């Protein structure tokens, strides 16, 4: 087998017949497969052992040679080589065809490569190949010219003869007529009879004239056809062709079928054709030039690649190894076989029949029919169903051809090469494991024993529990008691990987240290649920075992759950307390002035009744008071603390030089809050407040920024334990009695009912139209719902469990409480329009039948939407991954000085709208600025340089930039990165998952695709209605797809191509809009702007909005109508930077509307890939073809090289490609073929003899190589670790001191190094005396 590590690129080309014969181990001559009695392969058949190798290891077919000692011998009796049966997976055969056939991919593909090469229309080509027309392959122009006069004279003579014959026949007929008339006259016949005879004679004479005329016309046609005869001329009329052959076969050759095509290709001069086409492209125009360009692409591909175009017509076809198209016996003696065997059988049958016919000298028409059938059977083998009806098997099922084996989800690429099943894995239901640490998971004993079986067996032998592996295996299978002890040792420090499908982002697989548990369910840490999106309602998870030391190290260092606390999409913590844990911590940190457990221990100021109470000298004393039942958990107290760091304000006041552990300070807090702070690192500033979910998130975010991951992991683990502990003790439960109903709800409803009746009356009287009624009712009932809801909120006491759950942030929101206790309110129908009758009851009261029916509309729509969304979102993720899979961090810094301008601070305005001199953060600072490097100095209004170019901007730096008044900053971005392949670490900035600068080798493209695709399911599917004005506005997932596919949006909005003042004119259903540019250039006129779509809205300085009107000022790129601009138009008007900003803003808008945080850099990576390609406009001195696509970096390199040699560089136009198109246009043919349109990609790659440089991830996965990312990157491959002196000393330090005479004093053998010492060097000869 070929070692994948021995080559760096993979090339695909066209195989010629000689190549096919060279690969082959013999010709398959018979259609038989195996003998039905002996079940042995038939000789020369599709499973022949002589061709493909023996079916049994080291045994020939006849049994003369058996055993490995005869290895390599070819049996003289049966001709089978003695070798391993595995060769039946590798050895190919071939079928010698009796007539050439064309390869269907090159003829039927779009565009038809054969058609472009030979300049024939695909329809004509089809007629020739399938024997419906003849084609002229060559003409002897010279001989024809020489003999033209003679031949013309011959034709002239022939015509004369035809005319003479005609005249003779007419004369005879005339004579006969006269005689007949005479006879009739003599017999006294009537005039009627004479007329009949006369008419009949005239009719006959007319036929004679017409026949002669036809004959002369035919001769003229034959002659004219012959005179104009040229190669590649098609003759459909069979009779004319046979006449031409009969008369002039010495002057031309022609034919039909693939044979004629083969002759044409062999006579084809590629270089001359390329020159001719280049001339047409230079001088031509319009359609002619376009076609010449397309043809030149195919001709140039053959010229450049050195492929032989004749290879598109096959004289022999390969037969793939039999093990790849197996035949297996079923119970009952029947056989199941691969479809390919049927298809090969058809080819062989027809081929043999054709050979026999040719040998017998059968008539041409029969032979041609058989050749056509052979061509069709080879077509079916290569790509069944591509032309005509597919060949079907039993049950009318189309047979799977070679192309079908590669295509689609079940094809070779996606099913077997990109997605393999792996050994050492198991799956089971998951349950919660609250007792686990974050880096642990509970593994059922039986599953662990099965997974670690080999490790356990090895240890059993090592520990002498078993003599050999076989007995160890028996012990394991019988589950002897010692097996469990050994299993404990085997799993120690050996991480396992847990995966939950669907794996939407990289945190869908994480590593954990296994802990053995009883039962059969896997136990999962509660904090890991968020990342896996797991819950415990029957979800299943898969366990995988990393085997090699490297795999274990990577699992532990990179994938361990405690190292993956932050989300790679936004940098926010994912391992966060949720649900019950949040409630518990919220309950713990509440403050109640009078606590349930008695308030004597609570803090009271000194008053006339006595001194102040509730002050404690330490946390321990306060705890003791609680244990005695004097102090409540949530009662306010004053306490002196020395083991926890004070809040920042107190520290600044009391300890200007910084607080040291042990220094005392006084806190006004509650016991619960001190307990909460005990969970945090001791040197984290004391947090004195109620810990709702958002506050907890802020703390964990801060911890992640300040402390190592291990500390954060330990802290969240403690928070988890405390959360569950106090949630249990908080007694938060929900019962029907906790849902309080509004006492005066009926009155409120009656008030609004009256207003609704008034609106209905207005409609009946014609004061308002239907549209206005709808809007008024919707607004009215929404107001009613809100009023009822807010009233409900007020009647709930603080200690009611329902608002407590909501306020803590554990689950739900206030609207759900309104629905429970107030009223459900407005619901939508399946079209998304509101039903104007609201649901007036709450779930506590129960819905009426009609209300329930109305409610079910929208709910059902929601469920259907979710199902559709999941599939759509998955497909979007797949396309994103495909387009970005080769974006890997390749170097530290590309050195570019370009960057993207982002807003940092905006001025604070006073009541009059003037700047106050203070600044506040720009709106999207987190996702745009933080985590990047500066491309230019950050300067404020005074010109002070706050941070220099190259500085990193984290949270603290961003804060300072805002405070100093830096309005905008130019940051490094992947879109401007100049790294040849992939991106550089400086342009990418901080890895969101680690908070550090991204490592070289990080597959940032995949992370970006997952970050955008993973929240895809949360996006809505809906189109927003704009009440008829702007039609529908696409939102949610469809909008994201529209943007990433660079589609022209529905209801496209034209954009201003220049800056200036507008003038509007009304033209009935349309507007005409004229822009007068500020720079004095010609006016720009936009005609036929739809009124239905509506004019765009513009903002006035005061923040008010209005529709565009005459006199308004517009800037370049501003939309003129409602709707979304076309990205291609934005690129044309605003250039690359404009379209980059447009795409990022628009995608972010959709995600922000759903409350999803994604850093801009992820979207930028996808946008970079969309703008990677340029179109060649003018080739200059380069070899490039106008109209061809080229990678931006490659274009830069080519122009640089040409300029060095003094040539003229090519001119390019920037293209924006949708992600699907961009994936298919990738340099890697393996990656493109495994994505979509497999046959088209492979056809194109083969003609161009494409070479895949194996740069991306997919192509390396496909060929089974380590991916060039992470630890698989070349620079990390051959690292050898040299221990430092300190490490060596640490590893081998030994503190034991023997100090006895036998071993000598310490130091007698020098410093201890851990190296073995030869005893005879030390004077020992092994004579230790008699030890017995």
Swiss-Prot record:
Keyword Magnesium: yes
Keywords of the record: DNA-directed RNA polymerase, Magnesium, Metal-binding, Nucleotidyltransferase, Transcription, Transferase, Zinc
GO molecular function per UniProt: DNA binding; DNA-directed RNA polymerase activity; magnesium ion binding; zinc ion binding
Task performed by this protein: DNA-dependent RNA polymerase catalyzes the transcription of DNA into RNA using the four ribonucleoside triphosphates as substrates.
Binding site for Zn(2+) 2: 894, 977, 984, 987
Membrane-spanning segments: none
EC number: 2.7.7.6
SUPFAM superfamilies (UniProt xref): beta and beta-prime subunits of DNA dependent RNA-polymerase
Essential cofactor(s): Mg(2+); Zn(2+)
Organism in which the protein naturally occurs: Corynebacterium kroppenstedtii (strain DSM 44385 / JCM 11950 / CIP 105744 / CCUG 35717)
Note on how the cofactor is bound: Binds 1 Mg(2+) ion per subunit.
Homology family: Belongs to the RNA polymerase beta' chain family.
Chain sites annotated for binding Zn(2+) 1: 60, 62, 75, 78
Pfam hit, one: RNA_pol_Rpb1_2
Assembly: The RNAP catalytic core consists of 2 alpha, 1 beta, 1 beta' and 1 omega subunit. When a sigma factor is associated with the core the holoenzyme is formed, which can initiate transcription.
Binding residues annotated for Mg(2+), in chain numbering: 535, 537, 539
Coiled-coil parts of chain: none
Name of this protein: DNA-directed RNA polymerase subunit beta'
Matching SMART domains: RPOLA_N
